[in-house]
Amino acid sequence: MILPTVFDPEEIDYFDIDRQHSHEFYVPVKGSKKRILSNLGPTNIHHVLYTRCLNYLDRKINAVDVGCRDGEFTRYLTWSFPNVYCFDYRKSLYFAGNVSLQAVTHYTVALGATQSQELGSGRNNFRNPVFDAPYQKRKLKENTQDTILPLDSFQLPEVNLIKIDVDGMEEEVLKGAVETLEKYQPVIVIEELIMADGLPNHDGIKFLSDLGYEEVFKIESQKTHRDYIFVKK
């Protein structure tokens, strides 16, 4: 059984309620554990997608953020949803400073098609062949692995929206959430990256279409980066 994440007090101390309805987020300083405040502005991709999603929701009860990272999308979800369930196999140093922990339930676990054990890379892409330093040490010296679970195993109630941004495992996440999708028909926000060979990094878009979902919004912020909103027909 996976218990919710417990954040360190020093991480929580960075939280400021006055920033919760702003676009200011703590972001990492490359190459260090330091953090700086950055104003992403209302046109940032997370806010644009969040705002668009509201057009397709008649109720706002429970949202799910898969690949929540530093809480850049999560915070916006807390503006509308009383309950937000967040998943990331890495515990971010910045999440608790960006998001009110009273509004979310965070799990430090990867989501996939079935329950399994696998060593993640420490990067956004769980299976990136290049490991971050702490994960490289685990790979070489420790007999520890990361847990992967299907979303359906959490039996979350009345899910209205699911956002998935996991750099390649999107289809696997969807396969592990079929019961939830069929029962609640949530709005889906999903990222797709175009690889060097011109192909997408996952087949989640086709999987959603096969489940009877249709694309209602698409934004291509870069030539290799697409985000979609899907709703059940």
Region locations from a protein language model:
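Phosphate/nucleotide-binding beta-alpha loop and adjacent structural elements of enzyme active sites
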Residues: 1-233
